[in-house]
Curated annotation (Swiss-Prot):
Function, in words: Catalyzes the attachment of glutamate to tRNA(Glu) in a two-step reaction: glutamate is first activated by ATP to form Glu-AMP and then transferred to the acceptor end of tRNA(Glu).
Family recorded in the similarity comment: Belongs to the class-I aminoacyl-tRNA synthetase family. Glutamate--tRNA ligase type 1 subfamily.
Gene name for this UniProt entry: gltX2
EC number of the protein: 6.1.1.17
UniProt name for this protein: Glutamate--tRNA ligase 2
Localization of this protein: Cytoplasm
Quaternary organization: Monomer.
Annotated organism of origin: Parvibaculum lavamentivorans (strain DS-1 / DSM 13023 / NCIMB 13966)
Motif segment ('HIGH' region): 33-43
Residues where ATP binds: K265
Amino acid sequence: MPTFSLVAYPRGCGAGSQEIMTEKKTVITRFAPSPTGYLHIGGARTALFNWLFARHHGGQFLLRIEDTDRERSTTPAIDAIFEGLQWLGLSWDAEPVFQASRAARHVEAVQELLDRGKAYHCYASQQELEEMREKARAEGRPIHYDGRWRDRDPAEAPAGVRPVVRFRSPNDGETIVRDHVMGDVRFPNEQLDDLILLRSDGTPTYNLSVVVDDHDMSITHIIRGDDHLTNAARQSQIYEALGWEVPEFAHVPLIHGPDGAKLSKRHGALGAEAYRDLGYLPEAMRNYLVRLGWSHGDDELFSTEQAIEWFNLESIGRSPARFDFAKLENLNGHYIREADDERLADETIALMTRNEGWKTDDEFRKKLIALMPGLKERAKTLVEIGKGAAFLLVHRPLTCDDKALQLLNPEARALLARLVSRLEARNDWILSEIETTVRAFAEEENLKLGKVAQPLRAAVTGSTVSPPIFDVLATLGRDEALGRIKDQAA
């Protein structure tokens, strides 16, 4: 597939740009976040839907950073978006476009609207605008600009006042947004006032910039949150005023929390990087996010390849999806059990090094891989795997948690003293020999295996939860395992 480069496209709004549109054959989607310091989980789903739709059609998925807020658009904030998308496995097909760098192009489009009579200069003062608002409130009307400079002679412009440029929105009729999710959404034009295109300081506004960028990037389908529906009506008018083809729209209901309210910080983690640090796998997040508002029959589990094959806009629901943390956790557990042990070990080490300051070596990695079948069987996150393997890093004598200490009563410590002598007599420290010895010891003591295994686990891990105890003993090695048992024996 050919690569896309915005800089190769002509900057004008004339024949060159129209040629781009007529040559366009490929489905092209985009994700256009504003840097906030993290990739919001709702934005991650939007990016995923755009990515899946482009991949389904053999098209292109592009990335645009809407960085016009220079204070918030710091390098770390922008990097957080890149890192979040990369972690999720959502690759883009061209160099990212930075909206702020295209301000001159946006101003060029405003001038074309002025030349076409589709925009005008407005010299209304802040005091006049405030009086408009107060009057509308007093009369119980929506607050709209009243168009006082719409048809006024520019010669009447007050001296020394820098105007804004407003769009000449149609006064009558309606604007219809034909949406793949919401159907036809109708907006009476009288409710869409003459929005500002260019501020008095010469900077372009959001709706103008988005239209110009989407046109120049040859975007064919705009998939985004339904909080942009009104923007879609305004943007459609700007497209038509410039003589450009309007892209197809799909406005997706926002994600809600378990309580039905819009997803917010009080519901828990919001950024993609937070889920990474909580120990979720990217393939689990992709599977979960695509099912938030989209469905394929009763299928819950499917690969990324299946999602690409099945994804379509018509199967996106019109009602907000609720984020279910327990469901995500269970889904993540499934993907952990399916994952390669070496990969899980490497990702767990990276995660716990980042979160807990782990210091590990190749020997630890080998032990972690050996224990992984038992560790991942019940784990729902990589953090749980890390906690389950932490006993490998501690030094003697172990600090036991409260539950482990309760198990290590005088009777249990005496039992361990008798067991350790039996284990010391073993020549081969291999799993099968260890298991045979411990089981035989339990029978001789007339005890169920659990009555021996529980204090043994507490002694060698400092916890009541661990991978299978025989795996633990074999992985620790003879000297370390016997030393830990002796430390707790009576």
